[in-house]
């Protein structure tokens, strides 16, 4: 899979940008706050329809303008795809694939598979459960459209059930309680499918990550990712029924996969609680490299790797390991300088310098 080019108009600090990428290693360098990450953000949005920063569309449109445009050209399995995305300040974004508008943004998932790695990915290890659920959902949604459909349906049911709980709390009635029975059935139906999907995903990650982490640490550490579902699939219906009165009291659904978590164990110790920052970084790197290998297995193609100022966060051994692991993947890297690549003798195929929203091809 190759990102051939990206064209931006009024996107963040870019009035206009047209970039053509090499199929191997592309370096985008420059000082901080010049617009390097904005380029990666535009590519990521064409994969998931959302910013990795969590930004709203109106925050992405260049200051003083009403809309922005992304055009991405991709080569996948010998077929060309053009993704056009219009972001508007006060309207829903418009998306087209090969000139054909798509009705729902979720239809974009799976067309281009992206693995995005930035220093913020350390949050997957050290922050709260929502970061780890988001990781599972974003990766699974790119690989499995059925999972994505179940996730969308579950979130709709969850929102409707929470709204109904508030109505019941303020004005209880038999009719509302009967409606709650219906939403409970839907919650269990879609929630169970999500739990099964996440369980299978983590099992696959574990078959890959153990070897990667062992090699990364010279064999002195072993890693295991433990999926911790909030409820067991077999007990889900009963758990929801038993928590009903509590849910009505607090006006929110207390049981389900929206409460799931992951635990990362290094040598049987929870790295979030007991690991050093170096161990947490290594665990995050192992996880991202495992993502790459899993995508290869599932789609029978390589993903596009976006590295946002990551090498500066790693020591020389981990830099070398990462660089040696991505030789067959198109990689687009942002950084402030070229020293890490020169020191690691990395083959650089294309170099771009960014200065205040202006990009110069230095090849």
UniProtKB/Swiss-Prot annotation:
The subcellular localization recorded is: Cytoplasm
One GO term describing the cellular component? cytoplasm
Q: List the disulfide bonds.
A: none
Q: Which GO terms describe its biological process?
A: DNA replication; DNA synthesis involved in DNA repair; double-strand break repair; SOS response
Write the record's keywords in alphabetical order, separated by commas: ATP-binding, Cytoplasm, DNA damage, DNA repair, DNA replication, DNA-binding, Nucleotide-binding, SOS response
In terms of Pfam families, this protein maps to: AAA_23
Instruction: Please give the superkingdom of this protein's source.
Output: Bacteria
Quote one Gene Ontology molecular function term. single-stranded DNA binding
Membrane-crossing residue ranges in chain numbering: none
* InterPro entries with a match to the protein in the record: DNA-binding_RecF, DNA-binding_RecF_CS, P-loop_NTPase, Rad50/SbcC_AAA, RecF_2
Q: Where does ATP bind?
A: 30-37
Q: What is its main location?
A: cytoplasm
Reported function: The RecF protein is involved in DNA metabolism; it is required for DNA replication and normal SOS inducibility. RecF binds preferentially to single-stranded, linear DNA. It also seems to bind ATP.
Similarity remark: Belongs to the RecF family.
Q: What is this protein called?
A: DNA replication and repair protein RecF
């Amino acid at each position: 899979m190759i990102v051939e080019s990206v064209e931006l108009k009024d996107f963040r600090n870019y009035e206009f940008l047209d970039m053509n990428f090499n199929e191997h290693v592309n370096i985008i360098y420059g000082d901080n706050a010049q617009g390097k990450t904005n380029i990666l953000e535009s590519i990521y949005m064409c994969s998931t329809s959302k910013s990795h920063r969590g930004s709203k569309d109106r925050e992405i449109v260049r200051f003083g303008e009403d809309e922005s445009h992304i055009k991405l050209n991709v080569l996948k399995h010998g077929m060309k795809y053009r993704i056009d995305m219009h972001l508007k300040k006060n309207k829903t974004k418009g998306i087209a694939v090969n000139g054909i508008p798509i009705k729902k943004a979720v239809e974009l998932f799976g067309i281009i598979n992206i693995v995005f790695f930035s220093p913020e990915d350390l949050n997957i290890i050290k922050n709260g459960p929502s970061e780890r659920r988001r990781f599972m959902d974003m990766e699974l949604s790119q690989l499995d459209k059925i999972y994505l459909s179940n996730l969308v349906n579950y979130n709709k049911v969850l929102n409707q059930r929470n709204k109904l709980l508030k109505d019941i709390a303020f004005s209880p009635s038999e009719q509302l309680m009967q409606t709650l029975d219906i939403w409970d059935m839907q919650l269990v139906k879609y929630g169970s499918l999500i739990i099964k999907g996440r369980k299978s995903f983590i099992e696959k990650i574990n078959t890959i990550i153990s070897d990667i982490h062992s090699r990364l640490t010279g064999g002195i550490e072993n890693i295991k990712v433990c999926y911790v579902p909030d409820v067991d699939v077999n007990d889900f219906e009963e758990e929801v029924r038993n928590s009903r009165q509590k849910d009505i009291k607090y006006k929110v659904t207390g049981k389900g996969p929206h409460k799931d978590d992951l635990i990362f164990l290094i040598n049987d110790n929870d790295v979030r609680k007991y690991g050093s920052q170096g161990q947490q970084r290594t665990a995050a790197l192992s996880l991202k490299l495992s993502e790459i290998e899993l995508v290869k297995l599932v789609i029978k193609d390589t993903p596009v790797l976006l590295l946002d100022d990551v090498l500066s966060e790693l020591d020389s051994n981990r830099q070398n390991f990462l660089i040696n692991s991505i030789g067959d993947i198109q990689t687009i890297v942002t950084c402030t300088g070229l020293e890490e690549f020169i020191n690691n003798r990395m083959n650089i195929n294309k170099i771009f310098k960014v200065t205040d929203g202006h990009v110069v091809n230095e090849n």
